Amino acid sequence: IETITQTPEQCAQDVDAVLIVDDGSGAQWKYAEYPLRKGIPTFCDKPLAIRAKAAAEIGQLARETETPFMSASSLRFVPDIIQLRRELPQLGNIHLATAACGNDLIYYGIHALSMIYAVLGPGAISAMNVGRPDTNIARIRFKDERDVVLMVGERARMRAGYQINLYGTNGWKTVTPNLTDLYTYLLEAFLDLVHSGNESVPIEEEIEVIAALEASHRSLELGREVSLSEVLQAK
């Protein structure tokens, strides 16, 4: 390493782009403020924020400064998920789908839910979690008459891994994606954004994913259905 800096701001000087990795705080979004204000293309590791409102604020800054900005799960870009998206028309209309993974609801559930978004697109409006603190079973309702069941179990409950199931009017499909080189595909998508301006994952969509996860978490705490608008407006 030729240059060692003392602050994140110094690290973002005289560079072509900024990569912000997950520091375990769930608040790495705060390191994006400086490069975004300087107009430096920025990638922020998932989850952009634990709270949807914080994610929305940094997303608004990216739009206001017109700076290329990306935050996304690497599972959006693995070949198996890309191929599933291509095969979607063969399955007919999808009104029911499931996604599952092990570990924490937000930190790892974002990968499972991102597979759903990569294949079926956005549109979540509410979540109802009928699971337990260590075994989440969240029904996420979408505005296009689609329901997605997101199952995320802590390590004591299930092993790590990812799976997506689509139940269409013409056929069903189950995919357990191959995760080989998954970070390579993610970085390729970011470089494409830097070079061409092509947004593979609009920041508004990533904010919605975080809002759906937060709504799922709050639903379990409150014992009721929680809308995405509720978490986005929370103080």
What are these regions (language model features)?
Residues Q10, D14-D22, L193-K235:
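C-terminal helix-rich "cap/oligomerization" subdomain common to oxidoreductases
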Residues H95-R159, E204-A211:
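Rossmann-like dinucleotide-binding domain that binds NAD(P)(H)
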Residues F43, L48-Y107:
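A contiguous active-site-proximal alpha/beta segment in oxidoreductase catalytic domains
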Residues E2-Q60:
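Beta-loop-alpha module in the N-terminal Rossmann-like domain of NAD(P)-dependent dehydrogenases
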Residues A32, L84, A189-F190, S216:
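Generic hydrophobic alpha-helical segments
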